[in-house]
Amino acid sequence: MVNMKASMFLTFAGLVLLFVVCFASESEEKEFPKEMLSSIFAVDNDFKQEERDCAGYMRECKEKLCCSGYVCSSRWKRCVLPAPWRR
């Protein structure tokens, strides 16, 4: 009888310990996505888009000239790929 009480106590203590470990792990995991997203979307000066002298694909070409390989569409006023009928 004593042996059964001891095994039940150890089982219960093990379950409580497992609950505490899982709770601590889950609380850390809740903070992890927030930290990850803030580091991904953090604005870094090295990765800011540089101003170009020319406009790239589907950029407005009113004031800027299109980069090489693109032409300014008279219809949409955007830089597009040249097509045979646009030449």
UniProtKB/Swiss-Prot annotation:
What does this chain do?
A: Ion channel inhibitor.
List the keywords (alphabetical): Disulfide bond, Ion channel impairing toxin, Knottin, Secreted, Signal, Toxin
Q: List the disulfide bonds.
A: C54-C67, C61-C72, C66-C79
Main localization is secreted
Q: In which tissues is it expressed?
A: Expressed by the venom gland.
State a GO cellular component annotated for this protein. extracellular region
**Which positions are cleaved off as the propeptide during maturation?**
25-52
Q: Where is the signal peptide?
A: 1-24
Domain topic, free-text comment = The presence of a 'disulfide through disulfide knot' structurally defines this protein as a knottin.
Recorded family membership? Belongs to the neurotoxin 10 (Hwtx-1) family. 51 (Hntx-8) subfamily. Hntx-8 sub-subfamily.
Q: Which domain of life is it from?
A: Eukaryota
UniProt xrefs under Pfam families: Toxin_12
Q: What is this protein called?
A: U3-theraphotoxin-Hhn1g
Q: Give its localization.
A: Secreted
Q: Name one GO molecular function term.
A: ion channel inhibitor activity
SUPFAM superfamilies linked to this entry: omega toxin-like (SSF57059)
